């Protein structure tokens, strides 16, 4: 029999190693009707804490300008959501009892570990990063979620980097289990001096939902009853990013293009299936392209389509991402014809892990010294499986140079 796999837990310590935050995951899923709760544990050195308190904050922020342009007290950043939790001393009426993971961590880490809990509102945007240009420095623009733990006498007191922990988490969405109808569109163009003859274009996709890296099959059917000749057919995939902040603006960027010299003569028909695949690897140099939030040692991808719950307040949302396929007929002597097909580009929903029920009774555990620097804790207690601790990753884009170790994400 093989060894039982451990439960992975992410950790990150303050520069002075007096404060350590533990989280069971970095990605929190928006299920439209609810969002996964943020439950973690903070471990504190009691000799260092003295008469101070331990606070944990969750912030959702939208950075819409370069960090090096923040001058004269002006910041190109808007906080969309801020929540604060006092981890120590514990509140007299905690919002909820510890989760199973928190309970296990509290037992392993000892009496100086304290739980914290946050609920992410449903109307907040998902984590999106706008791809920086080659000359851009500092933090990339976009929407991110940050957890910060620090020691202070009050929440208003300014915290210091040496005794605080900052780490980035992601709010993500996965593909719906039931996709929508097959996208299709058609249009007819009548030309002057053509004796009421027309050029008809019909296009469709084989389905509405595609996963990242999956090719799109675009079915194009042309009926040319006009006197003009279709010289070329262009198929492109465009990303649309609606920036909802002080006002709403839409930016579009082609992420895949295909051009074929397929001619359609007058009084003839044409039918063909074009295959096109939108990939980030073909768009590395495009500044402002929306990407999914990325973690260290993990390559990112084009931003997933945003699914908005019906009735949601779009003014609160930071970046809404959508995709369309555009089919264009290049006609001789002008008068091009085109249609657009909206589709959804997302990651598939991963298989849910089976959570074993908590045992009704358990033998009393013996207090043993715990080395919090260990990567893996081996125990033989039947009521608790192994926990594997992994250092929390710093948020960066692939190809970007690492900053100094005092960076808040290191």
From Swiss-Prot:
Give the record's keywords alphabetically.
Answer: Cell membrane, Coated pit, Cytoplasm, Cytoplasmic vesicle, Hydroxylation, Membrane, Nucleus, Phosphoprotein, Protein transport, Signal transduction inhibitor, Transport, Ubl conjugation
Hydroxyproline-modified residues are where?
A: 176, 181
Outcome (variant: residue 207 to R):
Promotes agonist-stimulated down-regulation of CHRM2 and CHRM1; no effect on internalization of CHRM2
> Coordinates of motif [DE]-X(1,2)-F-X-X-[FL]-X-X-X-R motif in the sequence?
386-396
Q: Which domain of life is it from?
A: Eukaryota
Tell me what the record says results from residue 361 to D.
Almost abolishes phosphorylation; inhibits internalization of ADRB2
Q: Which residues carry this modification: Phosphothreonine?
A: 383
Instruction: Write down the Gene3D superfamilies for this protein, in alphabetical order.
Output: 2.60.40.640, 2.60.40.840
The tissues in which it is expressed are: Predominantly localized in neuronal tissues and in the spleen.
- Name the segments for region: Interaction with AP2B1: 378-410
Where Phosphoserine occurs, the residues are 361
Location of this chain's protein in the cell: Cytoplasm; Nucleus; Cell membrane; Membrane, Clathrin-coated pit
Query: PTM comment for this protein?
Result: Phosphorylated at Thr-383 in the cytoplasm; probably dephosphorylated at the plasma membrane. The phosphorylation does not regulate internalization and recycling of ADRB2, interaction with clathrin or AP2B1.
What SMART domains does the entry give? Arrestin_C
Which SUPFAM superfamilies does this one have?
Answer: E set domains (SSF81296)
A Pfam family annotated for this UniProt entry: Arrestin_C
Outcome of altering residue 107 to R?
A: Promotes agonist-stimulated down-regulation of CHRM2 and CHRM1; no effect on internalization of CHRM2
Location of region: Interaction with TRAF6: 241-410
GO biological process annotations for this chain's record? Answer: adult walking behavior; cell chemotaxis; circadian rhythm; desensitization of G protein-coupled receptor signaling pathway; detection of temperature stimulus involved in sensory perception of pain; endocytosis; follicle-stimulating hormone signaling pathway; G protein-coupled receptor internalization
Known partners and oligomeric status: Homooligomer; the self-association is mediated by InsP6-binding. Heterooligomer with ARRB1; the association is mediated by InsP6-binding. Interacts with ADRB2 and CHRM2. Interacts with PDE4A. Interacts with PDE4D. Interacts with MAPK10, MAPK1 and MAPK3. Interacts with DRD2. Interacts with FSHR. Interacts with CLTC. Interacts with HTR2C. Interacts with CCR5. Interacts with CXCR4. Interacts with SRC. Interacts with DUSP16; the interaction is interrupted by stimulation of AGTR1 and activation of MAPK10. Interacts with CHUK; the interaction is enhanced stimulation of ADRB2. Interacts with RELA.
The molecule here is called Beta-arrestin-2
């Amino acid at each position: 029999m093989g060894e039982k796999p451990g439960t992975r837990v992410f950790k990150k310590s303050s520069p002075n190693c007096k404060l350590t935050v533990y989280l069971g995951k970095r990605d929190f899923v928006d299920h439209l009707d609810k969002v996964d709760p943020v439950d973690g544990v903070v471990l504190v050195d009691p000799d260092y804490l003295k008469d101070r308190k331990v606070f944990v904050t969750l912030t959702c922020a939208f950075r819409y300008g370069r960090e090096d342009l923040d001058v004269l007290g002006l910041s190109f950043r808007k906080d969309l959501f801020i929540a604060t939790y006092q981890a120590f001393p514990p509140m007299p009426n905690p919002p909820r009892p510890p989760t199973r993971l928190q309970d296990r961590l509290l037992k392993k880490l000892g009496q100086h570990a304290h739980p914290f809990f946050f609920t992410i509102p449903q109307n907040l945007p998902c984590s999106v990063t706008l791809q920086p240009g080659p000359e851009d420095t500092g933090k990339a623009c976009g929407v991110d979620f940050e957890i910060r733990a620090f020691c202070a006498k009050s929440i208003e007191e300014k915290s210091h980097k040496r005794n605080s922990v900052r780490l980035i988490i992601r709010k993500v969405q996965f593909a719906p289990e039931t996709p929508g109808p097959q996208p299709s569109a058609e249009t007819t163009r009548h030309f002057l001096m053509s004796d009421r003859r027309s050029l008809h274009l019909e296009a469709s996709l084989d389905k509405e939902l595609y996963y990242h890296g999956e090719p799109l099959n675009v079915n194009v059917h042309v009926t040319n009853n006009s006197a003009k000749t279709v010289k070329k057919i262009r198929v492109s995939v465009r990303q649309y990013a609606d920036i909802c902040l002080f006002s709403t603006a839409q930016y579009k960027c082609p992420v895949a293009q295909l051009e074929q010299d397929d001619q359609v003569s007058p009084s003839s028909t044409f039918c063909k299936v074009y295959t096109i695949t939108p990939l980030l690897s073909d768009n590395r140099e495009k500044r402002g392209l929306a990407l999914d939030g990325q973690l260290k040692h993990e390559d990112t991808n084009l931003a997933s389509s945003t699914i908005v719950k019906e009735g949601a307040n779009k003014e609160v949302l930071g970046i809404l991402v959508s995709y369309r396929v555009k089919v264009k007929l290049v006609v001789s002597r002008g008068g091009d014809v085109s249609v657009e097909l909206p589709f959804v580009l997302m990651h598939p929903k991963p298989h849910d892990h089976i959570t074993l029920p908590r045992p009704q009774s358990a033998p009393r555990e013996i207090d043993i010294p715990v080395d919090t620097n260990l990567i893996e804790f081996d125990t033989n207690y039947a009521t608790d499986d192994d926990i594997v601790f992994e250092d929390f990753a710093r948020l960066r884009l692939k190809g970007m140079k690492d900053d100094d170790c005092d960076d808040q994400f290191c």
